[in-house]
A protein has these predicted regions:
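Extreme N-terminal starter segment of soluble prokaryotic enzymes
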Residues: 1-4
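Short hydrophobic/aromatic beta-strand micro-patches
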Residues: 6, 55-57, 97
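Flexible, gly/pro- and Lys/Arg-enriched active-site loops
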Residues: 12, 41-50, 60-66, 71-124
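Short, surface-exposed acidic-centric catalytic microdomains
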Residues: 14-62
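Active-site microenvironments that recognize anionic phosphate/pyrophosphate groups
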Residues: 8-14
Length: 124
């Protein structure tokens, strides 16, 4: 399976994005990474976010990979008891899953947010 992951951070963003890419390289193969996009916080007042999309191959199914992503987020100090729109050490979401040329999963975030669609375009 080919997965495309959206990564974002606005707390120690450079460090947390570097940590995430290092960890993701351990569980994915053939990794490619978009350029980093700086975006304003959306839905709350806060520091700018660094966003990118990372693509890689994995034998893990969607749920197993998602569990791994949550573990990486938690390792960065991610707090889950805060409002949806708030500062983040790290946010990693599966935005696209392909099996060959077939789309298995496509997140609505691709159409909703330029900070997802723009870096994704670089990799597709």
């Amino acid at each position: 399976m080919k997965y495309y992951l959206s990564l974002g951070s606005n707390i120690n963003a450079e460090e947390n994005i570097a940590f995430a890419t290092e960890e993701l390289n351990k569980i994915l193969s053939n990794v490619t990474i978009s350029s980093t996009h700086k975006t304003k916080a959306e839905g709350f007042e806060g520091d700018d976010f660094l966003n990118l999309v990372l693509a890689g191959d994995s034998e893990l199914n969607f749920d197993s990979l998602n569990k791994e992503l949550k573990t990486i987020e938690d390792s960065s100090g991610r707090k889950r008891d805060v409002p949806k729109f708030s500062a983040r050490t790290l946010d990693i979401d599966i935005v696209l899953q392909l099996d060959g040329d077939e789309i298995v999963f496509e997140s609505d975030e691709i159409k909703k947010y330029l900070f997802v669609s723009e870096p994704l375009k670089e990799l597709i």
